[in-house]
């Protein structure tokens, strides 16, 4: 059935789907399998390298191939879900993701595993936009904040629980088990979706093949540039060419979408200040959080000497606080408004980053726990509010591509956070190490520990820990500033003319109280003007 918003043509509220909360469980399960899979892989690199005799380049492609394909296809798959049906696209994605996971378990060469990861990226790109867009169309305005908060909390559980879950699997089974576990989860979600969900899609629109190609090439080039820049340097010819290609394609995409009769992405959405403000807030929030686990996990393992499993458990306070405050956000958001909820949450996250910036090599886990609780609480308040504001500004017929844009800005923000905060960490660490540091110990704390183990130089270990902690503080201050900028943008841009009321009715192409659409507004969204 086509989308008609949350009201009938007569202006009466749509009847609530009695299976909607079961549907939400299926959507959360589908999202969880994607997040956990990526996080689990980070702890499986050593056994994969040993068993498949994979080089450093092979391992990099095993890790990056999924993300490149996933990020590159999001806008296209979101548009396809609006066009052909969100349930149908999600089912195809689950089928492909499960099959690719099965292929990954039997891979006996790096090339086969990379191929399986590429297929998993395609499957993930089909699944992810469909999940949030179905949440938007199944739940009405009153229940939607609660549903989005529940869906959002699953991401945090996967991010924190993935490495821990992977460590448990690898302690008892071979590395292929981290992929095999995806198969039954995908199968359950597939069957449950068939039984519980009705199809939903927007009005039929012509395909936009030029927009699809430009968005795919542009996003793949952008993400590749962001991930390779810290390792190769911006002066590297490959990075330089990829950066130019991404700019040309994405600028070309923007120009094309404003001229084509039926654009893949309605760029008129960015004329809505709530949508734009929420988008920027999400980018900067994920920018800060993207580098958090990269930087803090190294501190826990190399400075506090935690094992990988203990490091995973150390992030539990963040996940628990996020779950609690996700629920609180769902209750308070409709009362005080998404704008203030997002700004409050972002300010709390910034306080967590500033707390982490005070860490010293001799500090225990107490300060880390305090910071984790603050950041989990802030994320639990801010992310659902920003996502609800962003998706509330998207007409229902564009729910799929709106969800894809939410996923895309998160991917770009997280990748940029890893690149920028990682670069700050690396360069500051090198500057803090003495000029006569032996070997390559001034390049990373890993190299310093290797050099110390080889030469028995215990003083080098202490020097490296001091330098790393100072570098980490600099990275976290930058993260805090990014989040504070996001908070300011939330307050300034996410303001609606009628106060902090849900913005959907004022959005071009959104359903009006009588169930109709403004002809001019609808045309603006259709043509991207």
Residue ranges of predicted features:
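C-terminal membrane-cytosol helix-exit motif in multi-pass small-molecule transporters
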Residues: 144, 184-200, 218-227, 246-259, ...
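Transmembrane-helix exit segments and adjacent C-terminal regions of multi-pass membrane proteins
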Residues: 2-31, 274, 388, 450-529
